[in-house]
Amino acid sequence: MEVTPIPGAPLGAVVHGARVTGDMDKTHLEEIWSALDTYLVLVLRGHETPSYEEFLAFGRRFGHIPKTGLTSGAHPEHNEILIVSNLVEDGRKIGVGDAEWMGWHTDYSFRPRVSQVGFLEAVEVPYSGGGETLFTDMYALYESLSPEERRRLHSFRVRHALRTGYEETIEEELQREVTLGEGADRIQPEDGTSTVHPLIARNPRTGRRSVYISTLNTERIVDLAPDDSRELLDGLLAHAGKPQYTYAHTWQPGDLVVWDQLGTVHAKQAFDPAERRVMRQVVSIFDDPAGPWRAEAAA
């Protein structure tokens, strides 16, 4: 497997030789994990195009893949696979998404069992450009703060809620607030469209800490008055998109991008709605749902 850092980018690497289909031994899996922990975003190229079943199996090597919980927008036979597209055929929307800008977020932050790794594969891309996916390093935001600022942020909790425009397609029994706590072992991977998490997350593999917020799904800091919450969140979220912390991925058909969901936020650039953009996505979650939230003093 060949891993090449993306020239001039603060994060991200291109990977050739990853085994996306077929068997994968423990050593090869650990090589991918190591590259992911180092570069946060991996662009896999030059591999055999996986079937839907193989795509799902590849994602499962990195943790449990929950169902999307969508009544429409997911693959009809594999609800775990989200179809992301701007297509409408015979008056029927294909998948979820559109050609507009999609704001900064990390997938499933509104669930008590949050995402660990994202997998997004390009099936069709706009031929005249646009539709890039942007990734911002939120570990770098935490590490840029003073010790006093870090200690303060460790004391806060944040409410996340699903606010993406397709809430009505979520199965009704999942539309509720669920928070880790007593009886956490009974929480199902797909539970919840609203939850409360600590503001600071910790990667259980590397120990790095990130500021776990987004513009799309973060409602407020529950420990602050609304105006104070908004002021602090706006200040922190101004980090998203800064060039020194952000990689903009221009898609090629067949690209499979794998990224650290705990330590980054991502967004989508707008593109010409007359052109086609079709992707498929799965997300792995942490086996230990409390893993990212172990209480620790700020470094």
Curated annotation (Swiss-Prot):
Give the record's GO biological process terms. antibiotic biosynthetic process; pentalenolactone biosynthetic process
Named from the GO MF annotations, one term is:
metal ion binding
Q: Briefly, what is this protein's role?
A: Catalyzes the Fe(2+) and alpha-ketoglutarate-dependent oxidation of pentalenolactone D to pentalenolactone F in the biosynthesis of pentalenolactone antibiotic. Also able to catalyze the oxidation of pentalenolactone D to pentalenolactone E.
Q: What keywords appear on the UniProt entry?
A: Antibiotic biosynthesis, Dioxygenase, Iron, Metal-binding, Oxidoreductase, Vitamin C
Detail which positions bind Fe cation.
Answer: H105, D107, H266
Q: What class of enzyme is it?
A: oxidoreductase
Pathway field of the UniProt record reads: Antibiotic biosynthesis; pentalenolactone biosynthesis
- Regulation (activators, inhibitors): Activated by ascorbate.
Q: Where do the annotations place 2-oxoglutarate binding?
A: T133, W251, R277
Q: What is this protein called?
A: Pentalenolactone F synthase
E.C. number:
1.14.11.36
User: Which protein family is named in the record?
Assistant: Belongs to the TfdA dioxygenase family.
Entries under PANTHER family matching the protein? (3R)-3-[(CARBOXYMETHYL)AMINO]FATTY ACID OXYGENASE_DECARBOXYLASE, DIOXYGENASE RV0097-RELATED
Gene3D superfamilies of this UniProt entry? Answer: Clavaminate synthase-like (3.60.130.10)
Cofactors (names): Fe(2+)
